Amino acid sequence: MESLSEGTTAGYQQIHDGIIHLVDSARTETVRSVNALMTATYQEIGRRIVEFEQGGEARAAYGAQLIKRLSKDLCLRYKRGFSAKNLRQMRLFYLFFQHVEIHQTMSGELTPLGIPQTPSAEFPSAKIWQTLSAKSFPLPRSTYVRLLSVKNADARSFYEKETLRCGWSVRQLERQIATQFYERTLLSHDKSAMLQQHAPAETHILPQQAIRDPFVLEFLELKDEYSESDFEEALINHLMDFMLELGDDFAFVGRQRRLRIDDNWFRVDLLFFHRRLRCLLIVDLKVGKFSYSDAGQMNMYLNYAKEHWTLPDENPPIGLVLCAEKGAGEAHYALAGLPNTVLASEYKMQLPDEKRLADELVRTQAVLEEGYRRR
């Protein structure tokens, strides 16, 4: 390939940098548009639910069953994202954020009715899209979900504006709410100084990270793929094979299984079904020493699995926390949720020994680390 002359190097660098800026900007705007349209759609669903409930006494009486029936029918169509809890959240979202303005779109001049005069506007679906896409939702969907927990309207508006002004992430917003930043600002004699003390914005989130937001994946019905480090992924793969090689009792159910508790998303590394014990086994891999917080998190997973994943004829689920540390390993079963000690004893007899699992964890780490050193 013929190299560029020195005289054209500066020109090449200019077009190279310009294309990178163009692509990066387009990706960022694409994610922003997906988020805004998704959030606007959920608000519109909430509006329709509220207006249906307010459509007369007959509908008001039926409203108690509306969300339950909608959830059942929509889940048949879309599989996920439309639980009764989510629909109630959409309803609340509309009630709390009716102030969102609708701006003029770029697709054409607006008619007196506010619908752009384009050929696509002849179709009802196009009109709906143009209305929704024009709504201004600059914050991520997860931020609005967190704001719903703020019951005081003034406080909610304050946190919304400060999140926009300061560029807070959801985690930073949660921290400000937890430390009562709004109340402290009200009580302060120098409110301007308080507002200048806001936390700095977190590092800019890349588009590929934003598009993996569970809310976005759920809305688009995309496969929930989770990016792990090569080492952790290899470790989980080996552990999965090792568990299945222990005998015919273990049946593989899934990996990186996602669950939502309140407004937070979690993932369990491996999920098995033990045929003889007739129960689910949740495996959680931790890098580092075992801590009480690991046990608490596993108990939270087990409570969720018992309510949402366990079938009526199955026994309560059990957990296995595997802790991998350089040159060491630990394995701990979580059996506290079982109804009696007899069942717990039976489980222990049927399950692989904790020491055997810990030894396998250490051996696997050594093999993988040796493989990486030889690359």
UniProtKB/Swiss-Prot annotation:
It is an enzyme of class 3 (hydrolase). One of its GO terms (molecular function) is DNA binding. It comes from the Bacteria. Keywords: DNA-binding, Hydrolase, Nuclease. Its EC number is 3.1.-.-. Gene3D superfamilies: 3.40.1350.10. InterPro entries: PD-DEXK-like_domain, tRNA_endonuc-like_dom_sf, YhcG_C, YhcG_N. Disruption phenotype: Deletion of this gene results in a synthetic-lethal phenotype when combined with hypomorphic alleles of the replicative primosome (dnaB), DNA polymerase III (dnaN), and DNA topoisomerase IV (parE). The keyword Hydrolase applies. The keyword Membrane does not apply. Pfam families: DUF1016_N, YhcG_C. Possesses a PD-(D/E)XK-like nuclease domain. May be a nuclease involved in DNA recombination and repair. Interacts with DNA processing enzymes, including the restriction complex HsdMRS, the integrases IntF and IntS, and the recombinase PinE. This is Putative nuclease YhcG. It comes from Escherichia coli (strain K12).
